[in-house]
Amino acid sequence: MYPFAAIVGVLTAIFAYLLHLVLFSNLDYANLIYDQGYSLSWRILAVFLLPFIGIFLSKVFQVLLCGPTFVKSLAPLILKLDRNRDDIPFKDMFTHIISSALSVGFGGSAGLEAPSVLTGSAIGACVSRTLCIQGIPRSMLVSCGAAAAISAVFHSPIAAVLFVVEALLPECTFRTTLPPLIASACSAAFTKIFFSEGIDQAFFMNTIGPWGPRDIIAVLFCGVFTAVIGVLIIKSSIWVGTLSHKIKSPTLRFMIGCTILCVILFLFPMLRGQGYDSIEQLLVGDITALTEAPYQLQWLPPALIPCLILLAVFFLKPAASILTIEHGDGGIFAPTMFIGAFAGFFFAQVFNRLGIGHINPCNFAAIGICGVFAAVMRSPLAAIFLVVETTDCFGLFVPLMLVSGISSVFGRMMEPYSIYKKSLIAQGLISEDPLENRLKRLPVGRCFVSTPVTFKPDMLMADAFSLLKTEAPSYALSCVPVLNADGTLAGLVSLKELYDTTTYTSTTTVEQAMRQPAAVVHDTDTLDKVVKAMNKTKTSILPVLYFEDEKYVGLVSKESIFDKYLR
């Protein structure tokens, strides 16, 4: 198992490098288009149209090559991992590389982390299917690819594993954690050795200053503030997506969405792309990202510019990111970090202006990333190590731990679910209850019992009793199935009635004594459906039928379910 995890890690690192190469080539091409005209009107037109061109090309690529099944969110991946499935198409190994690079490379407002994770997951799934690996969960290498992708992009192997464990995997055990750990380490090592010049670390700053006991109060309040910002991102993202899908025509929805996106990015060019340049500026204390007015807004008073930029970051950036992802491709990972950096920096500036104390805005830019990331992704440990590994600010461990914990707690109070799991839980596909979640993953086939004896409807009850004593003297279930000649279920005979000879005469047939089951389940059902049917009908045993032809398979009881679940 572990050598295969290492293979997935190396392959994912290579594909992540290819994604960045394609992205940078698109950025160069977009800059070439921008520089072709020397007139101001040409450049303004290019700024407005380039995001539309990139998203349009991405959409055409998706429609022609991928069809309507193209997945752009991590929510379906979470569901596949929850169901232990590896049915990810082979083409997903390269489709996200091209699609996301077109969307983001031409100015779309999104990140490349989710496409990288989906690419890595597809690599893991293809390796699993190709090698026909036996004896391990089918989705194990899928999670290895996801961890390896984040590790390669951010050079953060620990945060990658923690994100997979906290946000993607349904359960955290030694067996589920060690393979992603190996894949993540191999991916980071391979990237460091062979691609260190091709993939830049997003932000590696040494301006993070020391913190003191007086900063603790500010950190506590910053945790609450970043929780509010994180919940705002979740709710605004869902609101924009819901509002967009109210437009029934796909063409009209695409045109309106892209027009709104282009207007937002035209007015606030700083929202374009992944936003790592702005994060880097804040981490070194450069307030240019907050004070420099774009050409389109230079007619406004300078004092108004920071307020407009902050409003755009907190309210328009989530909308722009969702529109980019919905109509093109990308992820919410980088936008979350972008908003978090501004949130932390803004909080520090306000705190200092109020005269409560003096805190380092650079420190709080990093702390803000941690807090908002923890609130949006519900991955507090991953948030801590992501900031530590990408900014090298090991001295901020305690403040990061505080803000991550507080933001996660308050974020969960305001919004119970992460941005990825909210839609899955709303559809009833997964549950926050670990017991129910496990039942959703177990098929009926794991728990049903093939009965050693069955009756025919025209049998006499006395003959049925003799048959049971002869064929299955230790029969432990509470009823015996009655089958028709074609193998379909006719009914059930209670074992209590069968043993109580006073309830029937010598001429009583099984058909006269049997009863219809309160409900039936199929071999394709999961155990959560079975338990719900048992609770609804107030029975402890149900017959299982084949889904294809409705023929009898066996019986499933609550005892067998709990026995299987508690193993």
Question: What is the meaning of each model-derived region?
Answer:
Residues S450-P452, R515-A518:
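Short, solvent-exposed beta-strand edge segments and adjacent coil->beta transition regions
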Residues A490-L498, V553-I561:
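Short hydrophobic beta-strand motif reused across regulatory alpha/beta modules
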Residues M1-R441, G445-T451, F455-L467, S474-V480, ...:
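Alpha-helical transmembrane segments and immediately membrane-proximal extracytoplasmic
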Residues A183, V403, L495, T507, ...:
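ATP/adenylate-binding site constellation spanning eukaryotic-like Ser/Thr protein kinases
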Residues A485-T488, F547-K551:
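Flexible loop/coil segments at beta-strand boundaries within sensory signal-transduction domains
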Residues F455-L477, L483, D500-T502, Q512, ...:
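The conserved cystathionine-beta-synthase
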